[in-house]
């Protein structure tokens, strides 16, 4: 069995490559609108097509990992993801671009599932949220790199070049991750009524509600930060700087919140999840006000907003995995991630419509309310010590 450090590094690198497109495409949102003639709502659909594909396939990816083994499932998923991105790069309409990104998302679904299962097996409870935090840090890391790289690539070779580079990264890192996983043994047999037992686990449904509320806030910030900053009269460079700031905040916060949640042998998970929502709610209100001030205020409040709005998911995922028997941890993660991914994809077009019809002030107030509601729901989660 490969060492925990090697697997964590490989899982994180593969996840960063996936996020280069799935979370970084917003960095060239204005260019996509111009090239494909998209409305704000249509742009939202394009930006989350990859996430939607992954969300629809996560549970199936869990079954594939159990049935085929982590290595074979990861190689197959990587091949499909690469093909989808190449098809998207060659598309000439918004609908074909959406389809290619959707197919790619289906393929990439195996990366987070295989990674989470491997980390649950290799890390004890007192280090597990930290390890998931490192892996989840790779999501905004990919977005941070793409915030710089995608606009530069688009300027040189258009959207086509940006997507082809993304395809190459997904292919190379996916293969490397599969090799790092090694020949892990497959489960002896299927767990009977696995998904029913996961959904009936103590506090699982409430945890999923928290995830639904929090991910709407996350998508609001990631997908519409750049258009909001531009609409407030700031330059494209300021908007890019704000997007980069949010991604840096996400990278730091996921490790910090994960470390905090590991305290008391993992007994601080619920309190940490509540605190992320409270910080996000306050950050949303501060950011809304800062858009009427100067550059420094926008960047500072974007940092605070991102620290809460993008820092919760590693804690939520590890809590989901710990509410099921250890042999079902990967599938339990997949269930939680499915809900989060699908809601993130479905909510983004309506969020764009909200901004277009109600304005950005109302938009950010709504996100603050949703973050606060998530924190209130999280308060009543069962406080259990993970095994």
Task: List each model region and its residues.
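A late C-terminal transmembrane helix in Major Facilitator Superfamily
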Residues: 323-358
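Cytoplasmic membrane-interface "Motif A"-like loop-to-helix N-cap segments
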Residues: 67-77, 263-277
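Residue-level signature of mid-helix packing/kink "hotspots" within the transmembrane helices
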Residues: 23, 51-59, 143-144, 247-251, ...
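Helix-loop-helix hairpin linking two adjacent transmembrane segments in secondary transporters
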Residues: 134-181
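Extracytoplasmic gate region of multi-pass secondary transporters
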Residues: 25-26, 203-251
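C-terminal transmembrane helical hairpin of 12-TM major facilitator-type secondary transporters
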Residues: 269-316
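Conserved MFS/SLC helix-loop-helix module at the cytosolic interface between two early adjacent transmembrane helices
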Residues: 56-92
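Cytoplasmic helix-loop-helix junction between adjacent transmembrane helices
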Residues: 100-138
